[in-house]
Amino acid sequence: MKSRFLLKIFIFLAVFGVDSVRAADCTEKTFKTGTVCVCSLDSCDEIPPLDITMGQAALYTTSHTGARLHRDVIYATDTEPFGTLHMTIDSSKKYQTIQGFGSTFSDASGANLKSLPDKLSDLIMKQYFSDTGLNLQFGRVPIASTDFSGRVYSYNDVANDYSMQNFNLTKEDFQWKIPYIKNAQKYNPNLKLFAAPWAAPGWLKTTKEMTGPGALNGKAGDNYHQAYAKYFVRFLEEYGKSGISFWGLSTQNQPTLGSDKKNKIQSTLFTAETQRDFIKTDLGPALAASSSGKDVKLLILDDNRGNLPKWADTVLNDMDAAKYVGGIGVHAYQDGETDNHLDETHKKHPNFFILGTEASEGYGSKDTHVDYGNWDRAADTASDILDNMNNWMTGWTERNLILDALGGPSWVSDYTDAPVIAFPAMAQFYKQPMFYAIAHFSHFIKPGAVRIDHSLNVIELEVETTAFLNPDGSKVIVMLNKGSLVSTEHTVVVQDAADSRNHYHFTLPHRAITTLYIQTSQF
């Protein structure tokens, strides 16, 4: 009887090709717009391990109904089953190499981590940076203060100190940035850090203020520009004294913001032309002459994609500037409006990587900044990553690691949502649906993976897809069913052009994200 029962189970799995495995428990809390997972010192859900063998696939699903990286094991079938969507992946056609995903060590993030018990903040770092968590590969580090700081500060407020003798890090660095960078490095020793200034010290600007509009005084090559270049080098040197080195450096966060007369936050105006001239005359040579800066990858733009490709053309067509540049930083706030700009930029400048340097949800003036359990923000996050990956981007970075219930702290009340929200009074944190949306990419797509060709048999406007080949030969397919127009569940059949005998059959629920991880040694 027992052998007959086991035979029936085997036949069921062979026919239907799915073996459901319960995910690690999420302590759910439901709100008007959706569900969060509550984490404390007693419990916190984790990503279920792959636990598959050659020829099997693991399917992870997150949905608006509450599934959070629920895992099913998919068994390949040698006959093509019925499906409403047929997807073919072809690893012989390769595109960009993926560098990884990341988040930002903002003052606000550090303040919130510090507000929690040490073991709980350590758990957050593990959830973000370990290979059992989101496996983040990048950390963005602000140079001095931002809108997500408790106050406005620079590293040298001594006017006319062109040699930067009075440069010094602040309490925010020693309390909120450096400790948590090191904590993250404990879980990912290969973490790539890139720094970005929101503003030059006020005395270097035309307005004499860090906040609001204004450019650097003078022009490239003068005392002001030379001093600002030294400011960058001194930052790298001082962090080096704490054992922290940097992979990359942005010339300026959102340089176009400095032209906005209504802008209230820290900013410094650069045009493409003035950024080009600053790089080739001042910053590039200063970094090249510095032991802490000579190997740093310099990023240009670090602003919305609508500035491309013209911005890249202006800087990178000048060989005296381009020789110092590693890549192009892009923000997410015009995504969906200007899809072809990334593709066009890559075609013109294929030797320079494109990196997503900032993205967030809930930043609009009329938005509910922190909206617990909001599924649409998870879908928007996934859609943004899918769009960027399919248009030559090599990585993607979240604006904050963790914020409070207001979406801060922020000295200028510039609140947003975040993947993790802190509740220090209860010694808890909430993992928003956005956290899981990021995990569908970052946990499975390994550094060095390449995007590969994929196609669907029909045009389905509500479904977005992408596919990757990992360095170990495993393949990753991410699908989003936004379901914002029509409530449609899809049955999906994935076929690998490299092995046409095997088909993977699964369900893509309405308003859901899935990741299919295929274990194979085939390249």
UniProtKB/Swiss-Prot annotation:
Superkingdom of the source species: Eukaryota
Involved pathway(s): Lipid metabolism; sphingolipid metabolism
Stretch forming the signal peptide: 1-23
Catalytic activity: a beta-D-glucosylceramide + H2O = an N-acyl-sphingoid base + D-glucose; a beta-D-glucosyl-(1<->1')-N-acylsphing-4-enine + H2O = an N-acylsphing-4-enine + D-glucose; an N-acyl-1-beta-D-glucosyl-15-methylhexadecasphing-4-enine + H2O = an N-acyl-15-methylhexadecasphing-4-enine + D-glucose
A Pfam family reported for this protein in Swiss-Prot or TrEMBL: Glyco_hydro_30C
Biological processes per GO annotation: glucosylceramide catabolic process
Catalytic residues in the record: 358 (nucleophile)
EC number(s) given by UniProt: 3.2.1.45
Disulphide bond pairs: none
First-level EC class: hydrolase
The keyword Glycoprotein is assigned to this record: yes
Record function comment: Glucosylceramidase that catalyzes the hydrolysis of glucosylceramides into free ceramides and glucose. C.elegans contains specific sphingoid bases, which are unique or different in structure compared to the sphingoid bases found in other animals. Two examples of these distinctive compounds are: 15-methylhexadecasphinganine and 15-methylhexadecasphing-4-enine.
The protein's name: Putative glucosylceramidase 1
